[in-house]
UniProtKB/Swiss-Prot annotation:
Tagged with keyword Isomerase: yes
Protein name from the UniProt record: Chaperonin GroEL
Residues where ATP binds: 30-33, 51, 87-91, 415, 479-481, 495
Principal cellular location given in the protein's record: cytoplasm
Family note: Belongs to the chaperonin (HSP60) family.
Gene Ontology CC entries for this record: cytoplasm
Functional summary from the UniProt entry: Together with its co-chaperonin GroES, plays an essential role in assisting protein folding. The GroEL-GroES system forms a nano-cage that allows encapsulation of the non-native substrate proteins and provides a physical environment optimized to promote and accelerate protein folding.
Keywords, sorted A to Z: ATP-binding, Chaperone, Cytoplasm, Isomerase, Nucleotide-binding
Organism expressing this protein natively: Buchnera aphidicola subsp. Rhopalosiphum padi
Database matches in NCBIfam families: GroEL, PRK00013.1, PRK12849.1, PRK12850.1, PRK12851.1
Gene3D superfamilies per record: GroEL, GroEL-like equatorial domain, TCP-1-like chaperonin intermediate domain
Length: 548
């Protein structure tokens, strides 16, 4: 076991505080409409430029191990806030820095760290309740646009695009953020169920001008097996040919003579047919095939259920109004499945999402939910250079998370005003002793930090502006973008309640742990033992030469 370096008391806390301040100072310059950029070096390629707090925090590692522990603990605040609400990382980092700095001053002055923490916790619990009282619902398109705009660093086009996407696929619908190709941001909405599997043969294409397969009112055969023998498909092919309708086959795989027979039938016009592989792998593939069967009113032909492809009939097939297949995707539009069956299937998925342990599983389950619910919206972000593209994409993702949070818990006045108002309302709060009162004051002072930093980044005097805002009431605050005072709601400067609440709670939680830290332990740096033995052969030979 490696030897450890141990530091106690004030010595440990000073080191930890240095790390906290290095990380927080790098992150907080990005806050507000006039926040500055941070340039991040990459091991290869061009450096990236960002105004996203969590992106900056993730890049910071310090050489001194004790300082690095402080930095990593604040990084945890940013990550937790990001995971909970998708935004508010810079605010959370700033709140944590303020609480730690003020709290450690009080500890150095002889206050009891545990009582300080209790005071901070008491203030935060009251502040969260007041935030909920200040919160107003965010349901209309205008409010959603404003929240998206603020979170995307005052980019109105992004805010409008997110509001449009939410209008089209619903507040709970899946909205993806992708890299576009042009210079304009675009919104692409896919109605119906789409999955990432294209046609198995280009000979199925019946629209050569667009390079796609289009099937009108097709039957849909779903098989949870590999099909290579044409004989087991003949009965169903004959039945479909008699009906005069096209056929889509979705199976684990289709190969050999089975695929060749379908291609020949399709090119000769005997049966209008196309085949694609089933989406996903393993259990996820079975679940997605079941989703498609519910959506189209058919059955999955599965040997596990003792179903035989050779004995299947038209009643086992699903149907849809239209199917469009290109080389990469298949889209099923207007499935004829029973609404009650679809709703029942949809209601199962939220429970599975709660039980899922990995983010990847949750993401895939959310995708399934959206596809069954009837649509996926894709935001295509475009920019002139790759560096700008990455920065813009991160901002759009932040804005999307913020708008979802706003719809969930409502909004409060932005620009740091809500926390200042909350601090004013609970200013008479008292603890059980004087040390707890100091803890409460530490938390109240920290609640002014976001407003002060926004003002500082815009080049104004923080104390003057903060006092002016404190003298006002309600939503009265400072618009740093235009350098004027007024009603923040009228200015369209809104913060999601969930983002502000999460930032405050996570900051206080981690900062409280840091204030009550008394000892820090880390590995001693390993010394490079350069062996003298490596140079001995040459030295020995030289000595022998002298003797001769």
């Amino acid at each position: 076991m490696a030897a450890k370096d141990v530091k106690f008391g004030n010595e440990a806390r000073i080191k930890m505080l240095r790390g906290v301040n290095v990380l927080a100072d790098a992150v907080k310059v990005t806050l507000g409409p006039k926040g500055r950029n941070v340039v991040l070096d990459k091991s290869f390629g061009a450096p990236s430029i960002t105004k996203d707090g969590v992106s900056v925090a993730r890049e910071i590692e310090l050489e001194d191990k004790f300082e690095n522990m402080g930095a990593q603990m604040v990084k945890e605040v940013a990550s937790k806030a990001n995971d909970a609400a998708g935004d508010g990382t810079t605010t959370a980092t700033l709140l944590a820095q303020s609480i730690v700095n003020e709290g450690l001053k009080a500890v150095a002055a002889g206050m009891n760290p545990m009582d300080l923490k209790r005071g901070i916790d008491k203030a935060v619990i009251s502040a969260v309740e007041e935030l909920k009282n200040l919160s107003v619902p965010c349901s209309d398109s205008k409010a959603i646009t404003q929240v998206g705009t603020i979170s995307a660093n005052a980019d109105e086009k992004v805010g409008a695009l997110i509001a449009e996407a939410m209008e089209k696929v619903g507040n709970d619908g899946v909205i993806t953020v992708e890299e576009g190709t042009g210079l304009q941001n675009e919104l692409e909405v896919v109605k119906g169920m789409q999955f990432d599997r294209g046609y198995l043969s280009p000979y199925f294409i019946n629209k050569p001008e667009t390079g796609v397969v289009e099937l009108e009112n097709p039957y849909i055969l779903m098989a949870d097996k590999k099909i290579s023998n044409v004989r087991e498909m003949l009965p169903i092919l004959e039945s479909v040919a008699k009906s005069g309708k096209p056929l889509l086959i979705i199976s684990e795989d289709l190969e050999g003579e089975a695929l060749a027979t379908l291609v020949v039938n399709s090119t000769r016009g005997i049966v209008k047919v196309a085949a694609v592989k089933a989406p996903g792998f393993g259990d996820r593939r079975k679940a997605m095939l079941q989703d498609i069967s519910v959506l189209t009113g058919g059955s999955v032909i599965s040997e596990e259920l003792a179903m035989d492809l050779e004995k299947s009939t038209l009643e086992d097939l699903g149907q849809a109004k239209r199917v469009v297949i290109n080389k990469d995707t298949t889209t099923i539009i207007g499935g004829v499945g029973e609404k009650q069956a679809i709703q029942s299937r949809i209601s199962q998925i939220p429970q599975e999402i709660q039980e899922a342990t990995s983010d990847y599983d949750k993401e895939k389950l959310n995708e399934r939910l959206a596809k069954l619910s009837g649509g996926v919206a894709g935001l295509k972000v475009s920019a002139a250079t790759e560096v700008e593209m990455k920065e813009k994409k991160a901002r759009v993702e932040d804005a999307l998370h913020a708008t979802r949070a706003a719809v969930e818990e409502g909004v409060v006045a932005g620009g740091g005003v809500a926390l200042v108002r909350v601090a004013g309302k609970i200013s008479n709060l008292r603890g059980h002793n004087e040390d707890q009162n100091v803890g409460i004051r530490v938390a109240l002072r920290a609640m002014e930090a976001p407003l002060r930093q926004i003002v500082s980044n815009s080049g104004e005097e923080p104390s003057v502006v903060t006092n002016n805002v404190k003298d006002g009431k309600g939503n009265y605050g400072y618009n740093a973008a235009t350098d004027e005072y007024g009603d923040m709601i009228d200015f369209g400067i809104l913060d999601p309640t969930k983002v502000t609440r999460s930032a405050l709670q996570y900051a206080a939680s981690v900062a409280g742990l840091m204030i009550t830290t008394e000892c820090m332990v880390t590995d001693l740096p390993k010394e490079d033992k350069t062996s003298d033995a490596s140079s001995s052969p040459a030295g020995g030979m030289g000595g022998m030469g002298g003797m001769m």
